[in-house]
Amino acid sequence: MINWYKTPKLVQRMFPKRVWTFPKETNAVFLTFDDGPIPNITPWVIQELKKYDAKATFFCIGENIKKHPDIFKTLISEGHSTGNHTNNHLNGWKTNVSEYVKNVILSEAEANKWNEKSKIKNPQSTITNHQSLFRPPYGKITTKQSKILQKRGCKIIMWDILSADYNTSISEEKCLQNVLKSIVPGSIIVFHDSVKAEKNLRYTLPKVLDFISKKGWDCKKISLG
């Protein structure tokens, strides 16, 4: 993970085809959760979001979808967006282009298995976002990998605020302040529904949701529409 709590504007300008923020005029913030679905953690996140009628985007690892399809199904049924986070949480800077792209496609396939079964019961069901929204693990992806995925129709979703909830060396309060000191309408915020991040996440997320609510901002999922 690239450890800027607030992504510098210069970095955002260097990669203009990647999505870093949304217009402030949306009056909304965009919470995102990487690395799930994980039992006990992802379901807890879903329940916390529901308390505020908040929607979010979950960048899922393919192997975790395979292990926990019921949780993945719940994400969709609760109205959240899902996106691709590779099949095995690959570091793009350490993976050749062919292997990286194949791993992304494997993750798509895991999501599509659920989608095809779901359509039998509900013809309107769709997880098109999962196939088209992509976040590189650690924020690390090469220019060539990026171009190939974009040609396949992927939107590469980055962020402007990193909670660093996964960092066990920082305090829960530091994690919270990483978010609160920089959040504005249009912000894309990174959390992790992972075992490693659980302690900081359970402390921080309810307080962030309360802060957003008191500001009168919406909490929206990222979608293609």
Stretches with model-predicted labels:
Residues 33-35, 60-62, 84-86, 136-138, ...:
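A cross-domain feature marking catalytic cores of carbohydrate-active enzymes
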Residues 15-25, 51-53, 64-66, 199-225:
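C-terminal domain-boundary segment and adjacent tail
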Residues 36-40, 60-68, 90-98, 135-142, ...:
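Acidic-and-aromatic substrate-binding clefts and catalytic sites of carbohydrate-active enzymes
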Residues 73, 97-104, 171-177, 202-206:
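Charged helix-capping and loop-helix junction motifs
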Residues 46-55, 80-81, 97-143, 147-151, ...:
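CE4/NodB-like, metal-dependent polysaccharide N-deacetylase domain
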Residues 4-93, 131:
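Active-site beta->alpha N-cap acidic-glycine motif
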Residues 140-180, 216-224:
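His/Asp/Glu-enriched short active-site or ligand-binding loop at hydrolase and phosphoryl-transfer sites
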